[in-house]
């Protein structure tokens, strides 16, 4: 075996990962080399990247254009049995158990696929704080997958690489599939599986890059809260005075838009931790949606798409131009790029002090929630566990009716511990830092229109500059929320949602309907004492 060194780091031995007769190891290659490798003329199928007019390479991830949660499994053993939030008949989630025998079969499949090949190895970090980060090693035979990992994880210095020992290994065998899946009781021939005792992730059958990124996020979500460190699916930014704000929200709530603020530096856009030193990014890059992207609407993301960025599943015309509006393959078109492709970021390390503002974003299509309300610690836990948003979905008769979404901790798909653990740790961190929490509705009200981005930005500004603390408040029944009666630069007539209806009884009827949905959803968290104690902090029906 030869090791092509692109650093001064020591030679690495892959036999300890079960790999044999490896022809060559290309470790932490430069972006220049990755560009040459992923665009080679002799590559075929999903391995080959196409150069676009913006300079970024575009790849096709095949039939998987998103994560495959039905194919996600975790080895149930002495390490995981007690703490893992396992799926059950009562509460379904993505943490499905497999035994060691099935794991061994899948590991043999992947190691056989990768053995005897020329391999790319990317060593990097998940977590900007050296005390709590995971040292990640990703092994793949596909150049663009190595590129994706180099973009998304934190890139080590040459000195760090010289003594690098992985805490967690990801072996990506995208080209192999499992023909024994039925007899093993699995969902399909494709798999994304984790063994926390061996600290290894195996991938087979899916080429989607996000399986590697979100796989490690799920692991951080397991290890950190057990050390009383918050692990969060959120964006974070920092003001000129060093004040830190974190934004939770599901897709479509404005998380990216509102945390990208010319007055504030970005810490990160998706995954963060909060420990004794403050808030820190898990990642060294961004993984942004590109559907309907335009330079005018989102200049930061558009300008980040240049050489070293990696596009997934976008339509590239024969002249190299990109049709960002084309969602025919998937609406989940993406681009990964290193964080430094964004100008206004926290440097040199993506971390800040303790957060003093925590913002839950919800796009309420029911027209019930106020545009902003300040939460008590118990309400903070309740709404964090609820993770509510709603969308307007057209029916066959052209009527639009709201569809609610509840996602625990605004990221249920990535949780590996019971959701109440994340709420408990978050509020503990907030109380120690004196942080305040706010529920911000970026959705609709009784006028039938969406709350304007100008009003929402005014609300966010009032939260961040503290002026909301000086506002007089009033009580909103059913949901038991305290709302300000006026804020600078915000239309006062929208702050009490009842005032946006011709008849306040309309609001009350809708509020009771939504409250019932909240109550029914929260019932699944009352299987422990912490969850039961929070019921009183949610909406109440007589």
Swiss-Prot record:
It is an enzyme of class 4 (lyase). NCBIfam families: pckA (TIGR00224), PRK09344.1-1 (NF006819), PRK09344.1-2 (NF006820), PRK09344.1-3 (NF006821). Its EC number is 4.1.1.49. The gene is pckA. Binds 1 Mn(2+) ion per subunit. GO terms for biological process: gluconeogenesis. Keywords: ATP-binding, Cytoplasm, Decarboxylase, Gluconeogenesis, Lyase, Manganese, Metal-binding, Nucleotide-binding. Coiled coil: none annotated. Monomer. GO terms for molecular function: ATP binding; metal ion binding; phosphoenolpyruvate carboxykinase (ATP) activity. Belongs to the phosphoenolpyruvate carboxykinase (ATP) family. HAMAP family: PEPCK_ATP. InterPro entries: PEP_carboxykinase_ATP (IPR001272), PEP_carboxykinase_C (IPR013035), PEP_carboxykinase_N (IPR008210), PEPCK_ATP_CS (IPR015994). The keyword Nucleotide-binding applies. This is Phosphoenolpyruvate carboxykinase (ATP). It catalyses: oxaloacetate + ATP = phosphoenolpyruvate + ADP + CO2. Substrate binds at residues 67, 208, 214, 334. Involved in the gluconeogenesis. Catalyzes the conversion of oxaloacetate (OAA) to phosphoenolpyruvate (PEP) through direct phosphoryl transfer between the nucleoside triphosphate and OAA. It comes from Vibrio campbellii (strain ATCC BAA-1116).
């Amino acid at each position: 075996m030869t090791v092509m060194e692109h650093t001064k780091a020591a030679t690495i031995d892959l036999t300890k990962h079960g790999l044999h007769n490896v022809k060559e190891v290309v470790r932490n290659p430069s972006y220049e080399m990755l560009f040459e490798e992923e665009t080679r003329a002799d590559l075929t199928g999903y391995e080959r990247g196409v150069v676009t007019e913006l300079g970024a390479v575009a790849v096709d991830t095949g039939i998987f254009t998103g994560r495959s949660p039905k194919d996600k499994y975790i080895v149930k053993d002495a390490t995981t049995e007690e703490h893992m939030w396992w799926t059950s008949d009562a509460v379904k989630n993505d943490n499905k158990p497999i035994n060691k025998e099935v794991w061994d079969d899948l590991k043999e499949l992947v190691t056989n696929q990768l053995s005897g090949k020329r391999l790319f190895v990317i060593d990097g970090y998940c977590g900007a704080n050296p005390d709590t980060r995971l040292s990640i090693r990703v092994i793949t035979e596909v150049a663009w997958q190595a590129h994706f990992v180099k973009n998304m994880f934190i890139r080590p210095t040459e000195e760090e690489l010289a003594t690098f020992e992985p805490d967690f290994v990801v072996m990506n065998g995208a080209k192999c599939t499992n023909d024994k899946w039925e007899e093993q009781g699995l969902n399909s021939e494709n798999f994304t599986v984790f063994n926390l005792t061996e600290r290894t992730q195996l991938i087979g059958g899916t080429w989607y890059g996000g399986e590697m990124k979100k796989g490690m996020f799920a692991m951080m979500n397991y290890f950190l809260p057990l050390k009383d460190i918050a692990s969060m699916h959120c964006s974070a930014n920092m003001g000129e005075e060093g004040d830190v704000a974190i934004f939770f929200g599901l897709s479509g709530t404005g998380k990216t838009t509102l945390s990208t603020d010319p007055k504030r530096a970005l810490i990160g856009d998706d995954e963060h931790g909060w420990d004794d030193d403050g808030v820190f990014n898990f990642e060294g890059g961004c993984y942004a949606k590109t559907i309907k992207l335009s330079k005018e609407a989102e200049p930061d993301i558009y300008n980040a798409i240049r050489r070293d960025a990696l596009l997934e599943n976008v339509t590239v015309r024969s002249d190299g131009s990109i049709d960002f509006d084309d969602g025919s393959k998937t609406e989940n078109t993406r681009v990964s790029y290193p964080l430094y492709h964004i100008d206004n970021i926290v440097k040199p390390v993506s971390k800040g002090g303790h957060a003093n503002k925590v913002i839950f974003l919800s796009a309420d299509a029911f027209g019930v929630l106020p545009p902003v309300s300040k939460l008590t610690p118990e309400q903070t836990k309740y709404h964090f566990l609820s993770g509510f948003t709603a969308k307007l979905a057209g029916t066959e008769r052209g009527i639009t009716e709201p569809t609610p979404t509840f996602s625990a901790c605004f990221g249920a798909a990535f949780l590996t511990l019971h959701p109440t653990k994340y709420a408990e740790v978050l509020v503990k961190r907030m109380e120690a830092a004196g942080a305040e929490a706010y529920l911000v509705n970026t959705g609709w009200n009784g006028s039938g229109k969406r709350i304007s981005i100008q009003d929402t930005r005014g609300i966010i500004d009032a939260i961040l500059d503290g002026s909301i603390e000086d506002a007089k408040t009033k009580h909103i029944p059913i949901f038991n929320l305290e709302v300000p009666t006026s804020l600078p630069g915000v239309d006062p007539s929208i702050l009490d949602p009842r005032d946006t209806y011709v008849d306040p009884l309309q609001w009350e009827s809708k509020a009771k309907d939504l409250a019932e949905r909240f109550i029914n959803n929260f019932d699944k968290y009352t299987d422990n004492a912490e969850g039961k104690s929070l019921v009183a902090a949610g909406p109440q029906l007589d």
